[in-house]
């Protein structure tokens, strides 16, 4: 709490090279990268860091295997290389994980075709992970006896990556890195909007806890507010060609007993 109060007191002193609004993964990474390059950076978030979209992930860093079916190969290639970069850059935080999937009899694709797809996926990732495996029913029963293979034609196993701790911790480590490099970060500080004053951005902010307002001066303003990007642009009077279109996904976890 004392660190937060100290950082808030520094926010309206002097001029920052960059003010970043939003402490999710994009804002946190931007703060760490810019601070590492020697820029003076301030980062604020109206809630907890990684307190919204960035803490509602599946904790996976994947290469987009499902997009092979829609033939979006360029995207799969890009995602696989990004996944590899994360594993290589943060080996204690992002680690390889194996996935095993069974294939029901009568499925629209033959098991050999799906297995070939996992090899394409592996090759798009430059063979960075362990090789895929084609599994027959007998092998699945031997290696994973908890899986019900009564109606299975076989299965396959391939690799992706996951966040070893969790998504929020992963994000905060970038916030911490930014502060270690001289950046100023404060949560529960809401941007009320910004205006131009010559070559500077003047952002009016409010301490959500005590209600006090302050002005933050910066040469550059980065709006990394996630789902609140459009709302903040309206507050600031910024017009953009593109706007957010929200979507929601579901990751369903079932009781282990229901698969036996």
Describe each PLM feature range.
Residues 223-238:
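Flavin (primarily FAD) binding-site architecture
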Residues 1-18, 33-37:
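Extreme N-terminal leader/targeting segments of oxidoreductases
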Residues 14-16, 210-220:
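Core beta-strand elements of the Rossmann-like FAD/NAD(P) dinucleotide-binding domain
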């Amino acid at each position: 709490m004392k660190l937060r109060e100290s950082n808030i007191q520094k926010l309206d002193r002097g001029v920052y090279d960059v003010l970043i609004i939003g402490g999710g993964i994009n804002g946190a990474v931007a703060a760490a990268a810019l601070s590492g390059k020697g820029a003076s950076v301030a980062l604020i978030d109206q809630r907890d860091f990684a307190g919204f979209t960035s803490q509602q992930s599946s904790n996976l860093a994947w290469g987009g295997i499902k997009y092979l079916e829609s033939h979006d190969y360029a995207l799969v290639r890009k995602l696989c290389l990004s996944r590899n970069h994360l594993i290589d850059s943060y080996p204690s935080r992002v680690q390889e994980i194996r996935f095993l999937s069974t294939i029901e009899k009568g499925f629209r694709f033959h098991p050999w075709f799906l297995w070939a797809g996992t090899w394409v996926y592996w090759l798009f990732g430059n063979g960075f992970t362990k090789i895929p495996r084609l599994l027959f029913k007998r092998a699945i029963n031997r290696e994973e006896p908890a899986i019900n293979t009564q109606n299975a034609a076989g299965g396959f196993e391939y690799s992706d990556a996951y966040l070893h701790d969790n998504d929020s911790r992963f994000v905060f480590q970038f916030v911490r890195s930014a502060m270690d490099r001289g950046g100023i970060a404060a949560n529960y500080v809401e941007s009320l909007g910004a205006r131009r004053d010559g070559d500077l951005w003047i952002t009016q902010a409010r301490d959500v806890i005590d209600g006090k307002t302050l002005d933050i001066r910066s040469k550059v303003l980065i709006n990394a507010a996630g789902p609140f990007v459009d709302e903040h642009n309206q507050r600031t009077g910024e017009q953009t060609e593109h706007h957010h279109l929200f979507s929601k996904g579901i990751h369903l976890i079932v009781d282990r007993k229901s698969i036996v």
